[in-house]
A protein has these predicted regions:
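Active-site rim helix/loop that mediates acceptor-substrate recognition in acyltransferases
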Residues: 31-43, 48-74, 78-80, 84, ...
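Conserved N-terminal entry element of GNAT/NAT acetyltransferase domains
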Residues: 1-21, 25, 29
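Short hydrophobic/aromatic beta-strand element in the GNAT-like acyltransferase core
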Residues: 71-76, 86, 118, 123, ...
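Conserved active-site alpha-helix within GNAT-family acetyltransferase domains
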Residues: 137-138, 151, 158-185
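Conserved GNAT acetyl-CoA-binding A-motif
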Residues: 119, 145-159
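Conserved acetyl-CoA-binding loop-helix of GNAT-fold acetyltransferases
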Residues: 121-128, 132-145, 168-169
Length: 199
C-alpha cells in the first residue's frame, strides 16, 4: 500500500496529455545523471527514439507519440499535485523494433509479436527523494495488474544496479541485452515478466 500522502492514478492516452510536462520534467531530472544520462528510450511500439535534441532530448515528442498509441497507459504517483513518480507503457505491435539490435539473437518464438502478447513497460521512474518507500512497486503493480497480455517486457540500463535489483525482486527475468539509442551509448538488459501466471 502507498504511503497515505501519495495518490496513485492510472490514465489513458487522452488523459495523460495533461501530465506531459510533469513527466518530462521528472524524467529530465532523473535521467540527467548516470546510469541513465547516456541511454534514450526506444519507442516500444515500433519506431526508434528520436535524437536527443531540445531541453528534454526529444522525450516530449516521443511521449506525445506514444500516448496516442492504442493501449497506452500512464500510472502516476503524486504528493498533493507534485509528481513524485510515474510509469508508462504500451502493448507491442507485430512490427515492433523492440527485439532488434540485440547483442545475441533470440529464437523467433520468443521475439515474434502478435496482438495481446506483450506489454512494454517503457519507463518507471521515482524522484530520488521519494525512493525506498514502495512507490516504485506501487506504480509497477498499478500499471501491470489486470493486463490482458501474456507477458510484459522492460529495458533497464545494465549500470542501473538498484533498478536491476528491484525488477529481479518483482519477478522479472533477463531475456537479452541490447544497445540503447543512439548506438554505442549504453547497454540495456531486456527483461520479461510472465503476466499470465499472475506474477
Amino acid at each position: 500500500m502507498p504511503a497515505p500522502e501519495i495518490a496513485l492514478r492510472l490514465l489513458g492516452g487522452a488523459e495523460a496529455a495533461g501530465s506531459g510536462e510533469d513527466v518530462s520534467a521528472l524524467r529530465a531530472e532523473v535521467c540527467g545523471a548516470p546510469p541513465h544520462r547516456d541511454s534514450t528510450s526506444r519507442d516500444s511500439a515500433g519506431k526508434d527514439g528520436a535524437s536527443r535534441d531540445g531541453a528534454d532530448g526529444g522525450f516530449g515528442r516521443r511521449f506525445g507519440r506514444q500516448r496516442r498509441q492504442p493501449g497506452f497507459v500512464l500510472a502516476e504517483a503524486r504528493h498533493g499535485g507534485y509528481l513524485v513518480g510515474y510509469a508508462f507503457g504500451v502493448p507491442l505491435r507485430p512490427a515492433t523494433s523492440w527485439w532488434r539490435d540485440l547483442t545475441a539473437p533470440l529464437p523467433e518464438d520468443l521475439t515474434a509479436e502478435h496482438p495481446g502478447r506483450t506489454f512494454a513497460l517503457a519507463e518507471l521512474t521515482v524522484r530520488a527523494a521519494w525512493r525506498r518507500q514502495g512507490i516504485g512497486r506501487d506504480l509497477h503493480d498499478l500499471i501491470l495488474d489486470g493486463r490482458a497480455e501474456d507477458r510484459a517486457t522492460a529495458a533497464i540500463p545494465v549500470a542501473a544496479v538498484p533498478a536491476q535489483g528491484a525488477y529481479q525482486r518483482w519477478g522479472w527475468r533477463k531475456a537479452a541485452r541490447r544497445h540503447a539509442e543512439p548506438p554505442g551509448t549504453a547497454l540495456l538488459d531486456v527483461l520479461l515478466l510472465d503476466l499470465a501466471a499472475g506474477t
